[in-house]
Amino acid sequence: MSLTKKTKDKKVNFEFNKEYIRIVTSKIANNDAQFITNSFSEMHPADAADIIEHLSQNDRESLIKLNNFNIDPEVFVELNESIQTEIITNLSSDSIVSIIKNLDSDDAISILENVPEEDKNNILSSLPPKDRFALLESLSYPEDTAARLMQREFTAIPSNWSVGQTIDYLRENKDLPEEFLEIFIVNEDFNPVGTVPSSKVLTSPRDTKMATVMSESQLLVPVDMDREEVANLFENYNLNSAAVVDKNNKLVGMI
């Protein structure tokens, strides 16, 4: 379960204007799903989301119900939470499953939190077992905890591995996140002991041990930490990411 990274080749200089909204509204009225799909596919997801947010509620509902129009997961996660919730009410369970299967776990949890309870079990039961169990575990924690914020897609490497072993593993393993800037280093108990930027791995000799190139982990986020405490931690220590650990200090995710 991972959001495919396609945005790098999308236009980021889209000029938003009311005239384009009028065109999109007209295409919705004419059931021209192909035009909208093609237009959105050429834009950065944030721009497509901006257009959807500027439509009237009735036009958004009509857009979602158009035949042959499926909202791109990359666009969906760019929408503000209130619009996401509104759109979810107009989507079938199958459509929600299709979106969730292509999202990182933290985004999937955010969506499931807004799904009516009676539909949640149907959606979860339609997901692959591995994804379903991971999401159920996150949902078992209180809403305002780190567990609901964390991403379960991360890259972890044993501290006794060499740089060469690590590079070979990263090349061969198909289940890793498609993009990552930081690698977590773990001991034999899967406790995080450090981090290494992926760029440093690529520039270090193959026989170098990962333990010698890592920066030791200073701050770990308990899985049940309140999300306000997490936010303060990131702000106070200027963090870009942090390891999330369970009660046994095992690495279970990242924020």
What residue spans do the PLM features occupy?
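Hydrophobic packing positions in regular secondary-structure scaffolds
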Residues: 2-255
